[in-house]
């Protein structure tokens, strides 16, 4: 886009001086958030596709706009076609979300089972007892024993869990969640695609946004990216920049921020080391102030668009302002129109000059 003075607006995503490449976007309905996401994807694709280091992406399409056949012409902006769209209603996602522990020590499986048990407990709002959580951890370990360490399935997990229940005919919160995951058949039993070396759009609008299935899809796909991260070589580096391999983009991200989402936290914390980055978009700036994780503190670029309401403490934290400067920024946010955003800018303070510590950008209209 452009700054108010007509100068081209750019974000330095892969410079050596950039500590991380995470981007968070807050904008209410009608703020132009979807177009901004499209512009960002188009930019990193068009600038990299003809180089030895193309930047790929995975987009969780909660609203179904990017995967809508009526919007198929959008895809050409990203150098992809409809084969990139993954619809879990029509076919399982073409990979297993579970780790392969073939030849690995049992202690690694024990640690992983606790992590997976915590995940299933976290994505469901129902009350889950400590006994149920422990039973699930044991079920995951036993499922891996049956596969000799190869990736398990939700069905195998369910069977092992039910074998440990006092009354297997009566569902508890865990077995109910597992049955939903088995019934929806969300994942293949083996990897048929490489998530990092391709571009994919996961169609999410068929599921309730705050429901178990939608949360499970995002959680376990991000968990899969963490598994891939462990096996990746470090990214290419030169004197000026580092390689960015992949962006994971979560629109309507607030549904994934209200519980302890460990894979997402891990990817944000260490993904940069191997060129894996995150873009989170949500409707309200409050969403990124999770009690589980401070997303603002870990984002290089908070992009603030038109807001339904403005949280004073968030503004103060992002821009480090008080008094008149705080009131100026708050007024600027309140006056934002569709397709406009403000971004923190430390140029003046670094030069020791008084002036605005933010800039307004008019985003290019793409879709």
Regions inferred by a protein language model and the residue ranges of each:
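Short, flexible loop/turn elements at secondary-structure junctions
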Residues: 1-4, 15, 29, 64, ...
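Basic- and hydrophobic-enriched, low-structure N-terminal and domain-boundary segments
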Residues: 1-28, 36, 40-43, 47-50, ...
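P-loop NTPase motor core of the ASCE superfamily
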Residues: 12-14, 23, 288-367
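Conserved lysine of the Walker
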Residues: 33
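A structural signal for short, well-ordered beta-strand segments and their strand-loop junctions
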Residues: 36, 58-61, 304
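P-loop NTPase motor domains
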Residues: 41-56, 60-276, 289-291, 324, ...
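H-loop/switch region of ABC-family ATPase nucleotide-binding domains
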Residues: 282
